[in-house]
Amino acid sequence: MKTYTKNPINPRDTRTFKGKDGKKEKEKFAVVPIPNTIETYVVSNYGRIFNVDKAYELEKRPLRKEDPKYLVTRINTRTDDNKVNCGSYAVNVLVANTFVKKSKRDVALNRVIVHPIDWDASNSRYCNLQWVNRTELSILKDIRDGKTEEKDYVRYVCLLLQLGYLNDDIKAIINLPMKAKVKFINDIRKRSIYPYICAKYKY
C-alpha cells in the first residue's frame, strides 16, 4: 500500500491533530484499499479523502437524512466488464480499513463493524474508531442509554463470558466503572456475586 507523509495534492495542507492519548500527530495518507479504482484515491488518518489524479478533496455527505453524521463518499471503480461504477463508501470504514489494524482477537471475535468511540459518526479520525461485533455494539448502546447499574454490568460480563471472552477482551470493550475490574470479572466467572443473574448464563 502506497503511503504519503504529506498531503499529495497540497503538502502545505497537512494537518496536525490530537491522536491517541491526546498526543499531537501529523496527518498521514495512504491509497484507499479498494480494488479497480479508475483514479488514484487517497485517505488520511484524519478522515479526509482525495482524488490525486484530479487534485481535489472528495465531498462527504450523509448516507441518510435521519442519520446526518454517518458520512459516505463516492468513488469510481471499473467493473469486470469494463463499465464504470460510482459507489458509495463509508468514510469511517475507509479510514479504519487503512489505519486501524485488526488484531488477532478482533478477527477471532468477528469484529467487522466500525464504531466511533465518541458516538459521533462524523468524527472519522482513526483514533476515534474501533472494531466491534454486533453483541459488543448492543452492549455499548445499552451503556450509552443509561443502563449502568452494577447488575447491568454483571449481565454484560456474563454474556461475554458465555461467548468465550477473556478478561482482557471484556476490559477492552466495556469501561467497567469499578476499580477492581479483574476481581469483578473473576467474581462473576466464579458466580460468587449476583448468582441469580449468573445462573442464567452458561460459561
Language-model features: locations:
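Conserved recognition-core residues within compact binding domains
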Residues: 2-113, 120-169, 174-179, 183, ...
